[in-house]
């Protein structure tokens, strides 16, 4: 991945840039549609391509719960599973530590999540988060 500044404003901290990944080039600032579970509601990958979307935001925690890392891994990663050849930005699931705090227990070693889907418990450490990202090929 490579980032370069294309222009900046001398009177402020504003700037434009270009992020180059193996999957696409993204001009910044950028509108990034949210596909929490790997899909953007109401829009197909073809629709996103027609709109010149070069990056989608997804969420590691939600992908882990549904459809699950095993299914994504068996399909050779999130890009192939989604039939999406552009860039995907995923977060680590850290936001859910706080947004779902009433269902979580934070320890010195990690976070015990209680699934909002079925109540099952899942313990996430930084290493577990990286393992999930690796399994879905991000």
Where are these regions (language model features)?
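Residues that scaffold, gate, or flank divalent-cation-dependent active/transport sites
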Residues: 26-27, 34-40
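A gly/proline- and charged-residue-enriched helix-loop-helix capping module
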Residues: 78-127
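Short, acidic/polar
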Residues: 39-50, 124-131
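Glycine-rich loop at the start of a catalytic domain that most often binds anionic cofactors/ligands
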Residues: 45-47, 66-78, 102-105
């Amino acid at each position: 991945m490579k980032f370069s500044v294309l222009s900046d404003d001398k009177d402020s901290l504003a700037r434009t840039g270009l992020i180059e990944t193996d999957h696409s080039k993204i001009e910044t600032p950028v509108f990034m549609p949210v596909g929490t579970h790997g899909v953007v509601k109401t829009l197909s990958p073809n629709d996103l391509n027609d709109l010149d979307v070069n990056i989608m935001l997804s969420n590691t925690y939600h992908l882990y719960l549904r459809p699950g890392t095993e299914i994504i891994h068996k399909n050779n990663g999130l890009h192939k599973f989604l039939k999406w050849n552009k860039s995907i930005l995923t977060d680590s699931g850290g936001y859910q530590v706080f947004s779902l705090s009433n269902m979580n227990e934070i320890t010195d070693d990690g976070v015990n999540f209680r699934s909002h889907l079925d109540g099952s418990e899942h313990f996430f450490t930084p290493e577990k988060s990286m393992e999930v990202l690796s399994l879905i090929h991000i």
